[in-house]
UniProtKB/Swiss-Prot annotation:
It comes from Arabidopsis thaliana (Mouse-ear cress). The keyword Repeat applies. Residues 28-64 are annotated as: Disordered. This is Protein OSB4, chloroplastic. The keyword Cell division does not apply. GO terms for biological process: DNA replication. InterPro entries: NA-bd_OB-fold (IPR012340), Primosome_PriB/ssb (IPR000424), ssDNA-bd (IPR011344). It is found in: Plastid, Chloroplast. Disulfide bonds: none annotated.
């Protein structure tokens, strides 16, 4: 463009010089007046000069709005499911699903060089929405997603294929950012909605975060119906969790072969009502009688029959003393007032076993 501009300038320079010589014949006052008028006309666009003279105040300043954390880093996109959905659950009963959204459908015939132009966005689904995504989303489905961008650290030296593997293994890592999905929709006309969804959702083409998990035989959902249909294959730990016999994070139901576990906080609504009429096998644990005055007297009189856990309690909720034979537990917070002054100094379980004496 610069070269073209110089060529044009050279071609018109003689005519400009000729015009300039003629203009110098005029008086200086007339020249200045003419130049001023022409300059003003060019600047103001002819006759509408007031519009250009107005300052930026003519254009309204953007309004201020309060900061909203829920909207921060929000994202709203339409794309294609690039990879099959990966599903997993954690020991504390949370369910996760992950996939990658791309700006165009994936093609098996695409060469590796073409893949460099793809725009990939890793997305995560949590809870009920993870079940929904795992049940219905398929590769190349066109979807509308809203959610929030989560920052992450890129693992050095990972190529695109390795990045997908790392994402599906842990749903974290390899990608610098991921999207935690809040709402999931199908794009109208892109595919038929699953028939098991309510009619309202079929018409709107919407998969909502609060969509109830239907009785489809998919992983994560069918386990609850297997629990109801085959209660003899499951153990019920609900009562034990309430009385402290097992850890509060222990599964509410666990298959007898140890292959599956379920937590009530993730149960579908329709399952909760059915569980009331189902009888399960309850694991046999030594029943701990409620500690009374006699147990505290026995503790003071026969300390060698009790485990002293005051120093090395496994958890804050564990008993301070536990009978070696009956399994009865005692908590100092429930002890009578006369007990504390009669108890010996704390002694660990290790020293009790090996006969280690504390030196004072």
């Amino acid at each position: 463009m610069q070269f073209l501009g110089r060529s044009i300038s050279k071609s018109i320079r003689p005519s400009l010089n000729s015009t300039a010589r003629k203009s110098w014949v005029l008086s200086s006052q007339q020249f200045l007046s003419t130049s001023s008028t022409e300059s003003s006309s060019r600047t103001r666009g002819g006759g509408g000069g007031n519009r250009a003279e107005k300052s930026s105040e003519e254009w309204p300043r953007p309004m201020e709005v309060p900061y909203q954390p829920k909207i921060a880093n929000s994202i709203d996109l339409i794309g294609y499911v690039h990879q099959p959905v990966q599903f997993d659950s954690t020991l504390d009963g949370k369910f996760w699903a992950g996939t990658v959204i791309s700006h165009e459908p994936s093609s098996d015939s695409k060469s590796e060089s073409d893949s460099s132009s793809n725009f990939w966005i890793p997305v995560l689904f949590e809870g009920d929405l993870a079940h929904t995504a795992n049940s219905y989303l398929k590769k190349n489905d066109r979807v509308h997603i809203t959610g929030q961008i989560l920052g992450d650290v890129i693992q050095s030296g990972a190529n695109s294929d390795q990045a997908h593997v790392q994402l599906f293994k842990s749903f974290h890592g390899s990608f610098s950012h991921q999207v935690m999905v809040r709402d999931l929709h199908y794009i109208e006309g892109s595919k038929a909605m699953p028939k098991v969804l309510p009619t309202l959702d079929q018409n709107e083409g919407v998969l909502k975060h609060s969509a109830s998990v239907q009785r489809g035989r998919e992983f994560g959902t069918n386990l609850w119906f297997d629990l109801v249909d085959k209660p003899n294959e499951w153990c019920d730990y609900r009562e034990m969790k309430q009385n402290g016999s097992v850890n509060p994070k222990h599964p509410d139901f666990k298959k007898k072969d140890g292959s599956q576990a379920l937590w009530l906080n993730n149960a579908p609504t329709e399952i909760l009502s059915e569980l009331k009429d189902v009888k399960f096998d309850i694991p046999k644990y030594a029943k701990q009688p409620k500690a009374g005055e006699e147990s505290w007297k026995d503790l003071v009189d026969n300390m060698n029959k009790w485990w002293d856990n005051r120093v090395d309690k496994r958890t804050p909720k564990s008993p301070d003393f536990k009978h070696k034979e009956t399994g009865v537990g005692l908590w100092l917070s429930d002890s009578p007032s006369w007990v504390l002054e009669k108890l010996p100094p704390p002694k660990s379980k290790t020293s009790d076993i090996y006969g280690v004496q504390e030196m004072f």
